[in-house]
Every structure is written in C-alpha cells, then in structure tokens.
Amino acid sequence: MNVPLTHLQRLEAESIHIFREVAAAFTKPVMLYSVGKDSSVLMHLAMKAFYPAKPPFPFLHVDTTWKFREMIAFRDQMAQKRGFDLLVHFNEDGVRDNINPFDHGSNTHTHVMKTVALRQALDKYGFDAAFGGARRDEEKSRAKERIFSFRNAQHVWDPKNQRPEMWKIFNTRIASGESIRVFPLSNWTELDIWQYILQENIPIVPLYFAKQRPVVERDGMLILRDDERMKLRPGETVENRLVRFRTLGCYPLTGAIESDADTLEAIVGEMLTARTSERQGRLIDRDEAGSMEKKKREGYF
C-alpha cells in the first residue's frame, strides 16, 4: 500500500536528492555552515542523505569575528558531536585592518568580512560547488534565484543569465574556475524549517529561544550587547528584556524580537501568526534598495 508523503517528507526528499546530485556531479563540494537554524536543518539533511557514511564534503564557516559567542560555542560543539570536517576561514586582511560594523558600517563590514572572505575560502580550497541554506521566501532576490545557481570565475551571480530548471533536472556543467551555489532549502518556508526542527528534534543555537537578555535599543532594533566591544551611545542604556532571535548573524547587525516562546512548540505557534519576514531583524538588508541582490552579485551567500 502506497502511503502519500507528507509536506515535510516531500521537502526532505527533494533536499536529499539535491545533496546526492551534487555529490555525484561535482569534484569538490562544500557546505557553508553559518550555524543558524537553516544550517542546522541543512546539516541534518546532509547526514541523512549519506548515512551511515559521513557527508563526502567539509563544512565551511566564514567567521567575521563578530558572531554571537553562543554561535561559536555551538559550532564547535556540533563539529565535535557530529564528527564532520569543519573549516573556519577569516579574512586576515580585514582582521588586520580591524574592519568592524561600528567604525566601518554594515555595508563595508559585510563586504570585507563575509563576501570577500567567502570568495577567498572558495578559491583557497578550490571548491566547485557550495551548499547554502538560503530560502526563496526570505527575500525577493533569493525568490528568483535557481536551486543550482551559476557563478563565474569571479564568483559573480547574474540574475538575468540563469539556467532553466525543469522537472528537477539540473544543469551541473561548469568550466574551469566557475562554480555553482546550491540551495537545497529553496522551496522551504520559515514555518517548514521550524516544523521540521520540531519533528526531527534538531539541536539549534539557544539564542532562538526566549530568555532575559541584555539588549540596547538602537536604530529601531533591539541589539544584544554580546561583549564589551559594543560601546553605548549617549543616552543609551542596557535593559534586560525577554527576547529571542528569528535570524542570526553578526551580533551588532542582528535585532532580537520580544517574545516568550521558549520551546520549539511555542516558536512554531508564533510562526503560524507571523506577518513579517525574519529578515527584518538583519541590519545588512537596510543598507540600500536592492542591497541583498547587489551583495549576491558580488559573491555573497
């Protein structure tokens, strides 16, 4: 008797198929591991896709040196627990020049410490395919991007020159120096992600759960003061509020939301009534009109 697949089972099957397609078609793939909820789901799917073997590719974390401390601790804990090969890359030039979100702004910081750093890492190791956790429901430029997203030798994405994808048939051909960014979660929504995390009991960074945290209200956002590098502006005070994060990145550029959702069930319930994008908590999306597409054209995730 054939039992119809559930919605989550269909999404899972599609993602696993994509992982296996890349492993078969490319010489040196890598998974970009940002440590957030989407990366956690991606890691879980990669483990399933190749079980009982380990995924046949390393996990790459581009460290800006401004991630939440809990994210870094969770990253190292998961690498040890799951036994995957973890590569951590810094833009050493940016570290030397002390590029940071406070003195240089979110645009310069993101370009130097994320985009340029990612291009450096891909060139250094010679990866020809890179898995990412982007979803089409997150943001308009991601909504029009293919699952297999072609990049030229300079890692540039041209949204007007994308390859057709019909009936799950993917064009994996590339010339020397070119690469593909692959997004197995393209057709998932934020709610799908949380329901799958709940169903599969996937470990996630504790920052996603509501807790009393020291935050500063700045530029219309609640910023967690994660260390002493964040100096208070005149008139600012640190308050303890019950908050959690819908999205994670560099702590000075990521806003918390007031919430009492401290369990997976409560988060799923909150998502069922959410009417705003999780990206509203990312300061980098406010740099300028179409800023995400501009970043992606330059080689961003």
Swiss-Prot record:
Protein species of origin: Rhizobium sp. (strain N33)
Gene: nodP
Single GO molecular function: ATP binding
Keyword ATP-binding: yes
Lineage, opening ranks: Bacteria, Pseudomonadati, Pseudomonadota, Alphaproteobacteria, Hyphomicrobiales
Family per similarity comment: Belongs to the PAPS reductase family. CysD subfamily.
Annotated region described as Disordered, given as residue ranges: 279-301
Record protein name field: Sulfate adenylyltransferase subunit 2
Catalytic activity: sulfate + ATP + H(+) = adenosine 5'-phosphosulfate + diphosphate
BP GO terms, sorted: hydrogen sulfide biosynthetic process; sulfate assimilation
Assembly: Sulfate-activating enzymes, NodP and NodQ, may be physically associated.
Keyword list, A-Z: ATP-binding, Nodulation, Nucleotide-binding, Nucleotidyltransferase, Transferase
InterPro entries noted in UniProt: PAPS_reduct_dom, Rossmann-like_a/b/a_fold, SO4_adenylTrfase_ssu, Sulfate_adenylyltrnsfr_sub2
